[in-house]
Amino acid sequence: MDYAKESLRLHKEWKGKIEVVTRVPAENKEDLSLAYTPGVAQPCLEIQKDINKSYELTRRWNMCLVVTDGSAILGLGNIGPEAGMPVMEGKCALFKAFGDVDAFPLCIKSNDVDEIVNTIYLISGSFGGINLEDISAPRCFEIEKKLTEKCDIPVFHDDQHGTAIVVAAGLTNALRYVHKEFSAAKVVINGAGSAGISICRLLLELGIGDVVLVDRNGILAPGEEWMNPAQKEMAEITNKERLHGDLKTAMKGRDIFVGVSAPNIVTSEMVSTMADDAIVFAMANPTPEIMPDEAKKGGAKVVATGRSDFPNQINNVLVFPGVFRGAFDVRASDINEEMKIAASKAIAALISDEELSADNIIPKAFDKRVGPAVAKAVAEAARRTGVARI
């Protein structure tokens, strides 16, 4: 199938992938008097007395704002907010289908950090959570940090944390399959943008042995002048051997390769220099850093990609619906590290020892167990860490 051509045809036919539907009857005068004036004044007064009542008397409790500035849309780059709208609508549709979360797209005409933060903050009282989407690095880090400080609702940049959570789940099971200890594993991550840095942080939080981050300019190491502030910070806490050089150098002897970068930049010869029973997560879309057959030719034992037409698809849809469902169910004020770790462990645990194989390290996107399992784990972690409000 020509997905580009067929998708364009369907988008013209659909005229949008989401819509607003009423949850109340509007058939007669009494219906209107209860849903709108004069009856609606009473819930307004209740909320005026206690803003938290907005979660009980409106749909706020289940509403997620999906925000972009159009600066990093999929692999298309900075195409602008309007051009990002089809992706945001699609994200909202997935929130509803996989987590029963009501999501609303917001495409902001600005690339200014403070302007974006202020815009979102000013309307945050209508929502239970904020999902940041397709915002370029390093601005995305600053936007998330400032919003988290200002807002009393969860803020989650899916390109960072959703990717990190599902990668960590997949690596947990891949290491289990090849009988290697998480704490001894050596990782190379190619792509030191929002996803790569967040993956690195979560793996370190989980106790991975060592991580080397690689950017288009080379290995992140203290003293490299080309690094941005986020990369400089990561250089101080990674790369224990203080390696310098390129990706080829970084891959030698590594147990794991994680790619969130560009197509066709890894060869089977490069994979052959990795440790025995190597694990390769080549997640560039639509064309991975190395095709699975080439990675296996180089000696990779487990291979994962971001694509649905190969085994072991690493897909954020396993994460964000359940994370927000769990956060909303306990009215969490934040999505903290413990909640992210809980989500990752919940996903990994769905693959039993009997089911585990080289081609089955992660649940399928349509596995109906995933959303509820993630939501339950996230809600429990929110309660344990004191960010649950009900």
Q: Can you describe what each PLM-predicted range is?
A:
Residues 1-155, 375, 381, 385-389:
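N-terminal ligand-binding/catalytic initiation module
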Residues 150-166, 282-285:
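Short, acidic/small-residue loops that bind anionic groups at enzyme active sites
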Residues 12, 55-60, 96-97, 122-124, ...:
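Solvent-exposed alpha-helices and their adjacent loops that cap or buttress functional pockets
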Residues 158, 180, 282-390:
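Adenosine-phosphate binding glycine-rich loop
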Residues 232-301, 307-309:
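Rossmann-like adenosine-cofactor binding region
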Residues 74, 79-99, 157, 161, ...:
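Glycine-rich phosphate/diphosphate-binding loop of Rossmann-like nucleotide-binding domains
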Residues 105, 131-134, 155-158, 189, ...:
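General beta-strand structural signal in soluble alpha/beta enzymes
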